Amino acid sequence: MYIMKRRITALVLVLMAVCLVFAGCSKPVKADISGYENEKITIEGLGDETINVTAGELKELDCIRKSVTTQSKGGEITVEAAGPTLETLLEQHGVSMDDVSEVTFVASDGYTKQFDSAFFTTHKDVYLSLADGDDPLQEDEQPLRIVIPGTTSDNWVKGVVEMRFR
C-alpha cells in the first residue's frame, strides 16, 4: 500500500512538472487579433513576385515578446512588442539582412519610413509587433507596428500595410 501511494505521488509530481514546462512554451502572441488577423501586408523585393501576408500568418512564425521603451514628443512610451522579428520574416523567405540594402515601411495613413543597411548594423532588433502584450494593437496601429529598441518613436511605424526591400 505504501509503495502504491509513493508511485501515485511520483506520477502526480511528474504530470505537474510536464504541465509547467508546456505552460511556459505558449506562443508569445496571446492577444486576440481576430479583428485584423486577415488584413494583408504587402511585401516587395524578397523575390520576383510581390508577396501578401496577413497578421494571422505572421503570428504563426517564431515570435518574441519584449518590453521596449522609447521617447516621443509626448514623453516616454513603453510597449510590449509581441510578434516575429524582421530577421525571422526574412529567413522565412530565404533572405538575410546582409542581402538587404534598404527597407521601407509604409503605413495605412501614407506615412513612410526608409532605413538603409547601415541603420541595421547598429539596430539589429526590429520587431514586427502584432500585439501590445496581451492586448490587440490599437486600431490606428493595426495590422502591424514596427518597434525598434534604442530609437525614438519617429522610427516606430504603426499601421504598416507594406514593406519594401531593396
Task: State each model region's role.
Residues 20-24:
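C-terminal motif of bacterial Sec signal peptides marking the signal peptidase cleavage site
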Residues 12-14, 152:
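Enrichment for repetitive, rod-forming helical segments
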Residues 25-166:
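N-terminal intrinsically disordered, low-complexity segments enriched in P/E/S/T
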Residues 15-19:
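Alpha-helical transmembrane segments
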Residues 2-12:
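Bacterial N-terminal signal peptides that target proteins for export
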